[in-house]
């Protein structure tokens, strides 16, 4: 087995190079910024490619040595991807709210995990019939709450050996706890992130769904590679195992030419109704397509412009919007 392959083209198609609006940046990320386009910082993918390779190598090495990797991503667009990648690679995850002390107060967290397992026994064992309806409801609610918070680490059995983090701004408590304990951190850093203290920084968009899917898929496959290497070191023949690990199918190709939809506005959404012919209903359709800013419309090529027009029911109108959007973007700068 080997580390998963990826290309700069894949990163481009996933929108990894799109940073935040230029006024929403952390100057410490300047070394990773290629330039500005339509008031959006563009990340230098020539640095992302080797940085991502180093992070994947760290994941593979950690797992090969019997270590645990903890995926951390609690923002909405990362929750499912993080959980799926961790499960697929036999690792661990936190995709709900990060509980303070989840690393630095592991003993208390362990007690909560033990309580979760006890509740499962109480609600599924022979004694379940001894509870009243109200008692079962109370116990079920407690179990669901613990499962949501701790389900991804219930079998971790101790502190992780490496954290993989999506969005260090949102997961700042997790990062600080890892740094305090000397646990290495591999993290996706957008242009508004702080790279200080990150062991394996990977400059890239941390909001776009397709970018997050790509990161999680690559890290999961790197962990699977580490499992394979670990088995080889132990003399285990993977071909004889009953259920070999699967690396999964590649992501679907993008339906867009160069446009990268956003899962939500970056900061405050622009008032797209300023564009000629854009009613509140049309603005909502644009939002549903992942369009929230004039800069996105200004950057559309002819293929994507035609598709946007067809999707909102105004074919041929988008070319005029592009010209207007460029003017509005220039005014914002």
From Swiss-Prot:
The keyword Cytoplasm does not apply. One of its GO terms (molecular function) is structural constituent of ribosome. Coiled coil: none annotated. It comes from the Bacteria. Pfam families: Ribosomal_S2 (PF00318). Keywords: Ribonucleoprotein, Ribosomal protein. GO terms for biological process: translation. One of its GO terms (cellular component) is cytosolic small ribosomal subunit. Belongs to the universal ribosomal protein uS2 family. This is Small ribosomal subunit protein uS2. It comes from Azorhizobium caulinodans (strain ATCC 43989 / DSM 5975 / JCM 20966 / LMG 6465 / NBRC 14845 / NCIMB 13405 / ORS 571). The gene is rpsB.
């Amino acid at each position: 087995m080997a580390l998963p392959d990826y290309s700069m083209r894949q990163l481009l198609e996933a929108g990894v190079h799109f940073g935040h609006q230029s006024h929403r940046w952390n100057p410490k990320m300047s070394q990773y910024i290629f330039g500005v386009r339509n008031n959006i910082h563009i990340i230098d993918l020539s640095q992302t490619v080797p940085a991502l390779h180093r992070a994947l190598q760290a994941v593979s090495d950690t797992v090969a040595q019997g270590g645990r990797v903890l995926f951390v991503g609690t923002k909405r667009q990362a929750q499912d991807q993080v959980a799926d990648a961790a499960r697929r690679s036999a690792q661990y995850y936190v995709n709900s709210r990060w509980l303070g002390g989840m690393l630095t107060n592991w003993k208390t967290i362990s007690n909560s995990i033990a309580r979760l397992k006890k509740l499962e026994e109480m609600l599924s064992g022979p004694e379940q019939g001894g509870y009243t309806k109200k008692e079962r409801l109370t116990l079920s609610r407690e179990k669901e709450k613990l499962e949501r918070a701790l389900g991804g680490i219930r079998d971790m059995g101790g502190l992780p050996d490496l954290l993989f983090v999506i969005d260090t701004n949102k997961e700042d408590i997790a990062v600080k706890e890892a740094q305090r304990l000397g646990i290495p951190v591999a993290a996706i850093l957008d242009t508004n992130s702080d790279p200080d203290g990150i062991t394996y920084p990977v400059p890239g968009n941390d909001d776009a769904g397709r970018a997050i899917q790509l990161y999680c898929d690559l890290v999961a496959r790197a962990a699977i590679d580490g499992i394979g290497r670990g088995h080889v070191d132990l003399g285990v023949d993977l071909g004889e195992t009953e259920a070999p690990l699967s690396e999964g199918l590649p992501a679907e190709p993008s339906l867009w030419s160069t446009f990268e939809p956003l899962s939500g506005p970056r900061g405050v959404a622009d008032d797209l109704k300023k564009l000629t012919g854009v009613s509140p209903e049309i603005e909502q359709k644009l939002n549903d397509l992942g369009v929230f800013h004039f800069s996105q419309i200004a950057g559309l090529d002819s293929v994507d412009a035609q598709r946007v027009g067809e999707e909102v029911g105004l074919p041929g109108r988008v070319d005029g919007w592009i010209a207007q959007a460029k003017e509005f973007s220039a005014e914002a700068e």
